[in-house]
Amino acid sequence: MYREKRRRQCCRAFAALALSTALFMPLPAHAMSLTLTEAIDMALASNTGLRITAEGERSADAALKQARGKNSISAEAGDTLRTSKSKDEDAQASNTLSLSARLPLYSGGANEANIESGEIGAQSARLTTERAREDLKYEVIAAYWDAVEASKKIEVQRDTVNKYDAHLKNVTVLYDAGAQAKIDVLRSSVELSNARQELVRAENTYAVSLATLRNLLNIDRTEELTLTTEVAYQPFDTSVDNCISYAYRNRLDLAVARAKLRRCELAVERARAGKRPSVNLTLGTGVTSQFQPRHDTSTDVSASVGVSWNIFDSGVTRGAIEEAEAERDIALLNVKKEEESIDLNLRKAYLNMREAEQRFTSTGDAVRQAREDYHIANERYRAGEGILLDIIDAQTALATAQTNAISARYDYARYRAQVENLMGTELTESEHAAAERLPAVTAEERAAAQAAYIEGGTDAAAKKVK
């Protein structure tokens, strides 16, 4: 019953603040309108950091190809031109063409471990990319709400400046009429100056937030943006324990950590293979043509099965095994640490979300009451019944109440997004579609990078000469 009542209070409060603050959103001319959904899709389709992570898939796939190739047939061709002269013999000259093929029959389990490790690595690379997409989504959400929150706080500070400016004019008129002391004029001027400084800080915070958002979206860093999505209160009914259980099942970075543990176990198997023999099948053929002292041609075909066994290496193999076992145990502990971090971070974000929810509920009537208090204090002062301190206190209380309401509202939105991210909530279908548009490195980009490197090197050399 209490939670349902609080939910209704939050919904009404969110709606009221959204309506009151939407009227004050800055709307620069010729700015690009951007919803939160559009911002997320743009980032998933163009973020440079995400492109870097995605390239790791190519690297992992290439490593898997190498591992499979080492367990398959390899062939070599050679051509040798030879000349020799021995004492009391005629000079000899010949040319030999050779072709050989080699197939590993048994590697002690090393090749098989390498292949399985490569397969796990390729899958882990894809999981890492997907987790990077989820993290990027959260970063965009947080940056978007940071910018919207900053824009609303600008209006609070601008309203404060306007009120202090109007009050200063009123006090000046009263002072000129002999109804107020000069100290009231001076104090009002100081408060106006302080309010203007707070406005400058708020405007800078907004500019920094937009710069962060543009960087995530990888758009023109001077692009004017109009953020059009209004945050709406969405109840979150999942318990913290259920959130943690969900995260243990769905966090992709935890899956990557577990996969790394398996790869370390395979590395132990690979190191132990050094104690076992290796068996290889080799087939070869060759043609030798002799030019001096006479012309002659001969061919040969060979087949062999070779066994190699490292019976003593002064402890090198034993050391490799111990190193691999240590790395395996480190990976095991890293999985445990990752699980503990998930638990802690989720609990912190969850508690912060609930705290922001309660703060917003408690600020529901504070803004209305602060406005009424300011109006009363201002009218009492104009009538000569109040003192300047009453107006200053009332204005400070009003600005604080407005700022607290805005902060609580956007803190809740950010912490909710963080909780969902820490749970490992997957992307939507439309977000996956946007992520599929992420481009690989193009030939034009490589050429431009090479040109920039050459130009930069030339400039550096020229400066060194000077």
Predicted segments, located by residue:
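Cleaved targeting-peptide boundary
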Residues: A31-T37
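A small-residue-enriched
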Residues: E38-Y106, T128, Y138, I219, ...
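Metallo-beta-lactamase
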Residues: A202, L252, A408
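Acidic, low-complexity, intrinsically disordered peripheral segments
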Residues: R3-R6, H30, N404-K466
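Sec/SRP-type N-terminal targeting helices
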Residues: R51-E55, R68-G69, L105-R133, R158, ...
